[in-house]
């Protein structure tokens, strides 16, 4: 099953998702009326997913799909949350890297969770996903909250790939 979330995109993303849904029964789509942000899109995708495990990844292919195989095998070994951690930040500007380092240092100090190489690229067991969805918070930081829920966790390094299309908003 694949769940695609269109977070208010102004290009033809939703039309493409609808085409894919017509061609393949295992594809689902969620379309937001406007851009609600990445966290809302992640919540919506997890809520729609029905599998025994759920992977969250960016559709711009900066999260390498081939890493999902390693994540899945770790899930089969009994891990409930498999965190994708950045081996490198890819080709970001110096100023972007500096601000990111400062931001994640503050978040790490506040939460007690090492966020220095964290990403939204994860695979979660159904149980972990259900507990995540039960949390009352709706203004969340998925990258940190998924580590906080307290399930058996491991990490997989990946190299951030060049963006295939689009840009961060």
Segments (PLM) and residue ranges:
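Structured inter-helical modules in multipass membrane proteins
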Residues: 135, 149-160
């Amino acid at each position: 099953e694949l769940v695609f979330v269109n977070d208010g995109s102004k290009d033809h993303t939703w039309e493409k998702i609808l085409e894919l849904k017509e061609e393949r029964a295992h594809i689902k789509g969620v379309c937001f009326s406007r851009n609600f942000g990445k966290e809302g899109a992640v919540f919506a995708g997890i809520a729609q997913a029905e599998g025994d495990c759920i992977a969250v990844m960016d559709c711009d292919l900066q999260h390498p799909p081939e890493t999902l195989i390693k994540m899945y095998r770790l899930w089969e070994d009994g891990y409930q949350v498999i965190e994708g951690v950045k081996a490198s930040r890819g080709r970001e500007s110096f100023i972007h890297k500096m601000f990111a380092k400062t931001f994640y240092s503050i978040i790490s100090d506040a939460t007690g969770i090492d966020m220095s190489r964290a990403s939204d690229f994860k695979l979660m067991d159904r149980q972990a996903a259900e507990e995540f969805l039960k949390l009352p918070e709706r203004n969340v930081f998925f990258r940190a909250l998924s580590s906080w829920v307290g399930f058996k966790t491991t990490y997989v390094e990946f190299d951030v790939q060049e963006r295939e299309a689009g840009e961060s908003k």
